[in-house]
Amino acid sequence: MKKEQNQRPSRKMKPVFLVFCEGETEETYVNFLRQQYKLPIKVITYVTGQALSQKKIDSYIKAEKISLNDKITSFLMYDLDTNEIIEKITACKSSINIASNPSVELWFLLHNSEQNAFISTNACIEKLRKSTKEWECYKKGILTDKQKKTLWEKRKIASARAMKLQNGRNPSSMIYLLLDEMEKTKEERNDRRG
């Protein structure tokens, strides 16, 4: 009986995405993406930019791994509003930088309009609220069903707009890299099933 158990092939874990962020808005958005893509995504919130380090990321990855073959991809979703956070993110070499400058609201704005000129976080939120009716009552940390619908339906438009911007500069958002990885993983999963 024991011999049979040892001969079973080891189970291969699905790819896991770890997303490090510090705010409720980012957490809400990533949880929404998890529902849409139906992929294993773990959001690690409230890791402030000052506390972010390669050592901390490595410890989270190690805790998630069941076997050496597990594929765990980590992402850093932060607002690039200070030089200190830029330095911290740059030092974390094993993770994919999906930061937005000045804030995640720029990513939301790119779903409805282009943004090529420098913009502050407050101006970005104000422009987002004026962009379309569903964003008029936008509050950080909350996404309404209509806002989620826009974010889902226009994600490819936002990605195309974000790709035209210079990464790390104001304005820029690299959140499209997370969506690209999720799209690839979903396609691979569907190909294996199909």
Sequence positions of predicted segments:
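Helix N-cap/beta->alpha junction signal
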Residues: 22-23
